Amino acid sequence: MERGYLTLFRVRGVPVRAHWTLPLGALLLSGGRFAPGLWVGVLLVVALHELGHALFVHRFGLVNLGLDLTGFGGRCRWAGHPSEVQRAAIAWGGVLAQLALLIPALGVALFLPMPRSPFLAELLEAFTRTNAILIAFNLIPIKPLDGAEAWPLFGHLRRQRARVKKWKQKLAPQTLREALDEADRKNLH
């Protein structure tokens, strides 16, 4: 154990670690009751969230250093120099991964009978209600939550679109002028 973390496994060389507070957080989340399906489900939701960040980190050519799971959430550790848009997209990666689980889980919850197994019922609760609550919580625009870096994505994209539009306007008259000159040359010859 290193600084309270135990390396569970590695994904492409990237360590996935659990902190000693993980069981404590699970117990608090379930209100002190024995709820192994909820515990496993929330662990999977948090792990999926962090993997979502890691996927975007990898996609942008940055370096994944590790995924840490604690009793109070998780953390994707990475290094590199992303653009503002990339940093915001990485922040959205966790929530997008959670949504990829939430949508089909809601379909199961809405259209299939409730599981008879307490473990499966708790697991479904973790994948739906608890997952939705964690998504909403993570999107609060306050550091260290993802919302602090995720929501600015729309402002970055709007500014980027305005810059592209400005360049198009500068280039369009020149392009039109060149096209007219070309047409005149063809008509004269």
Residue ranges and their predicted role:
Residues 1-189:
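Hydrophobic transmembrane alpha-helices and their immediate loop junctions
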